[in-house]
């Protein structure tokens, strides 16, 4: 199943195709739980390989919790034997996003997670 949700100035661009889930842009909408609920269901129902690519510029507190919920799903799928990994890209000078990525990594117990610093 292929899914594409275009982003806005407050919502991230989401794409999901052939086991690759990508989230880029900014995430600071009013009701993060409502926005992420169908994405959570999509990940829960997905079978097989699941590679996550994160490239966020900004993430508010409620979006952060929703993203963590999504990544816990990926972690559980990895433990169940699925081919899963997470790649988090952030701008080389964005210490806040780097710190957020490292905090997420510390909370995830199993799934491999790599970081990529990118130029502006």
Language-model regions, residue ranges each:
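STAS-typified acidic loop motif
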Residues: 1-37
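Amphipathic alpha-helical interaction surfaces in cytosolic regulatory modules
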Residues: 33-40, 49, 54-105
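Short acidic DE-rich linear segments
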Residues: 115-120
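Extended lipid/amphipathic-ligand handling interfaces
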Residues: 43
């Amino acid at each position: 199943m292929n899914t594409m949700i275009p982003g806005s100035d407050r919502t991230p661009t989401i794409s999901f195709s052939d086991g690759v889930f990508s989230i880029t842009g900014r995430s600071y909408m009013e009701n993060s739980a409502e926005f992420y609920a169908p994405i959570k269901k999509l990940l829960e129902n997905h079978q097989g390989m699941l590679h996550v690519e994160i490239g966020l510029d900004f993430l508010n507190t409620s979006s952060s919790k929703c993203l963590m919920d999504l990544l816990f799903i990926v972690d559980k799928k990895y433990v169940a034997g699925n081919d899963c990994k997470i790649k988090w890209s952030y701008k080389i000078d964005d210490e806040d996003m780097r710190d957020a990525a490292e905090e997420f990594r510390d909370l995830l117990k199993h799934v491999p997670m790599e970081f990529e610093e990118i130029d502006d």
